[in-house]
């Protein structure tokens, strides 16, 4: 349903990532409290997979979705999960080219590691900060790609 109401153009990419930052930060804050050990182990396995897929952007994007999905589920709020999925899906249209670049994938992996570490420490504030920083990095790399004429 969100896709029906939002049509993304360059001028509102910043609004999308502002919304994602708010949602992902709160989701991470809640997940730091609510995630169980199985979900944390799942995240750790996903990160291992991401290290192995850095040279395959399509595979990395799949594992990126699984990483975020596990955190959305771990937040314990099904509505936040659905909102996170919708905002993530909207961003993919603009993210595809940026996420082909090795330096972008490496930065995402570093961001994911920092977020995982905060979640593992059960530190809601650090988890929220890590999620928000990740969204800032995603936004920056997306806009860098846009300024190079490459949003697809």
Listing of model-derived features with the role each one plays in the protein:
Residues 3, 89, 100:
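Residue-level signal for pocket-adjacent positions within structured domains
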Residues 8-12, 35, 100:
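Non-transmembrane, amphipathic alpha-helical segments
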Residues 1-11, 42, 65-68, 143:
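Short, charge-rich amphipathic segments
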Residues 1-23, 29, 147-152:
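Short linear motifs at protein or domain termini
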Residues 78, 145-148:
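Short solvent-exposed beta->alpha transition segments
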């Amino acid at each position: 349903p969100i896709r029906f109401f939002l049509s993304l153009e360059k001028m509102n990419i910043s609004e999308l990532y502002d919304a994602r930052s708010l949602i992902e930060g709160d989701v991470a804050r809640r997940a730091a409290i609510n995630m169980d050990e199985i979900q944390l182990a799942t995240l750790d396995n996903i990160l291992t997979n991401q290290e192995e897929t850095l040279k395959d952007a399509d595979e990395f994007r799949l594992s990126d979705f699984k990483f975020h999905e596990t955190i959305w589920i771990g937040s314990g709020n099904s509505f936040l999960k659905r909102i996170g999925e919708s905002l993530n899906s909207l961003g993919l249209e603009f993210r595809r080219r940026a996420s082909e670049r090795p330096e972008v994938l490496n930065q995402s992996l570093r961001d994911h590691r920092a977020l995982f570490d905060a979640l593992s420490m059960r530190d809601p504030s650090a988890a929220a900060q890590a999620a928000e920083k990740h969204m800032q990095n995603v936004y920056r790399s997306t806009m860098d790609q846009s300024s190079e004429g490459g949003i697809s």
